[in-house]
Amino acid sequence: MPPPTAQLLGWELIDVDVEQGTIRIAFHPDERMLNPRGTVQGGIVAAMLDDTMVPALYALTGGQYLASTIDLNVSFIRPVQPGRVIAEGRVVNRGRSVVFMEAELLSEDGKLLARATSSGIPIELAK
């Protein structure tokens, strides 16, 4: 289930709630992902959040659907430091032609680092 970017981002599945369409993932950003200030570059943070929301749809549909992201909005709340961070993603609403998702990125001690909302086109996977 992990997307191809999983290895780069240090993707680690924590848990999935299929009925609720939620997922928790740990990421492990390292020094390759830092900006000149020594914090994780914003595009990497956005990728982590995107790589949390789409697997939430996959979980909700029992592995039948992924989403092609058509809109991604990220709010950067606090700088993300290298090391383990936790992302929580969920499907907010699933329609036939568009799915709406959201995710939060948290420090290990539970501080909100970033939040994202996304819409995507559901794509049925080959059976």
Where are these regions (language model features)?
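Terminal targeting signals and extreme-terminal segments of soluble enzymes
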Residues: M1-K127
